[in-house]
């Protein structure tokens, strides 16, 4: 919670102006961003974020087994890449998101957290 607050997340604004998670799931699934092989999801250490999105989309608990989680990932988020995982196999990519973005000449968007 502190991390989110330090990053600028406004819990009170979210409480008063946010949308229910069921509606978010409906918007996300009907947006064309899920179950679409033309969309590519790129994250940095995004497993927990995908976990929350899957739990919201599925409207029940996540699978107990990792294989079940990845089965669901492959359905809803057909193409996903986690730069933190990819960098393990690339010697010259070291450090956190900001450093890697700079090395790849990619503009970082969002606050560091």
List the model feature ranges, each with a label.
Residues 1-113:
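Metal-dependent phosphoesterase core characteristic of DEDDh/y 3'-5' exonuclease domains
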């Amino acid at each position: 919670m502190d991390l989110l607050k330090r990053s600028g997340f406004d819990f009170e604004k979210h409480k008063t102006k946010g949308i229910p998670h069921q509606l978010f799931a409906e918007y996300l699934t009907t947006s064309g961003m899920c179950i679409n092989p033309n969309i590519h999801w790129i994250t940095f250490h995004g497993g927990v974020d995908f976990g929350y999105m899957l739990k919201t989309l599925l409207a029940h608990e996540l699978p107990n087994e990792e294989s079940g989680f990845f089965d669901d990932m492959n359905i809803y988020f057909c193409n996903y890449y986690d730069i933190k995982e990819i960098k393990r196999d690339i010697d010259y990519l070291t450090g956190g998101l900001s450093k890697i973005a700079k090395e790849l000449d990619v503009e970082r968007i969002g606050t560091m957290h």
